[in-house]
Structure formats: C-alpha cells, structure tokens
Amino acid sequence: MGCYNGSELQDLGCSSQLLLQPLWDTIRTREAFTRSPIFPVTFSIITYVGFCLPFVVLDVLYPWVPILRRYKIHPDFSPSVKQLLPCLGLTLYQHLVFVFPVTLLHWVRSPALLPQEAPELVQLLSHVLICLLLFDTEIFAWHLLHHKVPWLYRTFHKVHHQNSSSFALATQYMSFWELLSLTFFDVLNVAVLRCHPLTIFTFHVINIWLSVEDHSGYDFPWSTHRLVPFGWYGGVAHHDMHHSQFNCNFAPYFTHWDKMLGTLRSAPLPESLCACGERCVNSRERCAVHLIQKKKQT
C-alpha cells in the first residue's frame, strides 16, 4: 500500500508503515543473501543457537552464582557436556541433512521477490499473533495425538522426552518427523495468511525464542508467562510439568486448549521461587493462599 494523501485511517496506516520502513530497507540491501538457498537454514540455526547460548552460559555459571538458584526450575540439575553436545549435534545434523534440501527445493521452484514497502506495524503484530495461535493449535493437536497413540509416541516423539529435566539445547532434540512437522506448520501459517517477509522473519524469531524459553529451565521475573495476563500463557514451569508427567499441558504456549479439554495442570512453584518466603512446593494458586494466611498471622 502506497502512502498518499487520504483519510485519517490511511494516514495512520502510512505512519505505522513508515516506522518499519528503515528496518525493511536495511534488510533489502542484503537481498542477495536473504534470497539465497542457504538463508533459511542459516537464519534458523543462528537464531536458535543464539537464543540457547545465554542459558548455556547460565548453566555453566550456575554452581558459582547462588542467586541463579532462585530462578532454576530444578535447582539440583545442571546439564552436562555429554547432554549438551548430542543436542547441538542433532540440531545441526537435521538442519543440514534434511531441512536444507527441502528449502533448496522450495527455492528452486519459487525464489521469493522482496517487496519494496514494509508492512504496517498493526498488520505485522496481528499476523504474528494469529500465526502463534494457529501454531499453538496445530501443535496441540499433533502433540496430543502422538501421546495418545503409543506407536506414534514410541516411533516419533519419545526422543524429545529423553531429557526429563529441561535445558535450552534440548528444545530441538527430537526426531526428524517431529522437526519436519513443526517446520511445516511454521511455514504453512505464514503462507495461508500471505504474510509480508518482515512479518515472517518476526514470527520465526518469536516462535524460536518462545520454544527455547519453554525448555530453558529458568523462570525469571520477565519470563513471557509473567507478562501475559490472566494465565493465558503457560511458560517454562508449565511445559516442564508436561515433560515430567507426560499426560498434561500439551499446548506449547497458550493454555486455552488444555483448559477446554481438561488436560491443564497448574505448574508447581519451585521452592526457591515461593512467594510465601518458605520452602513451599505448592502450586502457584495454593501458594497465594498460603501467603495470605501468613500475612493474617502476622
């Protein structure tokens, strides 16, 4: 949509578009790389490893930085090198051997042309949110199916559950079929919505970050589930419970599908995070009641 004199609504749209135009112009100066067949795999690997790296550093520092214990989901667990390297190796192997040929085939058939204009900010944000909700729905159905059908679980999903305690690099420790399914849903949604390339980049970055955060093993005050109100978002402790109990919390991000199907289970509050100030292992809701009772006693 070009910017021209018109209604106030059109002017507002142009203003929000102009907010993103400098960023989009910068990306377009590197169009030769962004349109190359190696870009999707390179972008995915760098983004994923880049998001995992801070948590790997925290795990290395954890024994010598006591304050980190307050935010660790499993205070007595820290991944070893023997756990980290196979996870990283499997991610690199699958992206290079399986994902790259698929993206190469797509590039040969339909090389993308980058538009000159950036998307409107409201459009970008709304499309990213819709893509996240669609992805959450699709993975919930896929995930539930692969837990309810024993053959599917043993053949395709069991690999991801080999690490019962979460850590960042275990996020993509999965079978090729599971990685292919996630990639398919990831690409399908942006294609159906005909998203702008900048929206696609943004969605992929956010999606990778949320998945890494869910497996990071750390629950910080700025974690996503603390920023989203009304318990709509599960978060790291929520997903960690799925890894420990298997029969609950199947949605990757949001909680509405698990609520509707009765598979939602409140995440236990780690001892070091308890708001009541004691070494409590109650759920978040019960801990809130515990805290109120403690205030009344004082």
Swiss-Prot record:
The chain crosses the membrane at residues 38-58, 88-108, 124-144. A motif (Histidine box-2) lies at residues 157-161. Residues 128-263 form the Fatty acid hydroxylase domain. GO terms for biological process: B cell chemotaxis; cholesterol metabolic process; negative regulation of cholesterol metabolic process; negative regulation of fusion of virus membrane with host plasma membrane; response to type I interferon; sterol biosynthetic process. InterPro entries: Fatty_acid_hydroxylase, Sterol_Desaturase_Related. It catalyses: cholesterol + AH2 + O2 = 25-hydroxycholesterol + A + H2O; cholesterol + NADPH + O2 + H(+) = 25-hydroxycholesterol + NADP(+) + H2O. It is found in: Endoplasmic reticulum membrane. N-glycosylated. Widely expressed at low level and at higher level in the lung. Weakly expressed in the heart, lung and kidney. It is a multi-pass membrane protein. Pfam families: FA_hydroxylase. Glycans are attached at residues 5, 163. The keyword Ubl conjugation does not apply. Keywords: Endoplasmic reticulum, Glycoprotein, Iron, Lipid biosynthesis, Lipid metabolism, Membrane, Metal-binding, Monooxygenase, Oxidoreductase, Steroid biosynthesis, Steroid metabolism, Sterol biosynthesis, Sterol metabolism, Transmembrane, Transmembrane helix. It comes from the Eukaryota. A motif (Histidine box-3) lies at residues 238-244. GO terms for molecular function: cholesterol 25-hydroxylase activity; iron ion binding; steroid hydroxylase activity. GO terms for cellular component: endoplasmic reticulum membrane. Its EC number is 1.14.99.38. A motif (Histidine box-1) lies at residues 142-146. Belongs to the sterol desaturase family. Catalyzes the formation of 25-hydroxycholesterol from cholesterol, leading to repress cholesterol biosynthetic enzymes. Plays a key role in cell positioning and movement in lymphoid tissues: 25-hydroxycholesterol is an intermediate in biosynthesis of 7-alpha,25-dihydroxycholesterol (7-alpha,25-OHC), an oxysterol that acts as a ligand for the G protein-coupled receptor GPR183/EBI2, a chemotactic receptor for a number of lymphoid cells. PANTHER family: STEROL DESATURASE (PTHR11863). This is Cholesterol 25-hydroxylase. The gene is Ch25h.
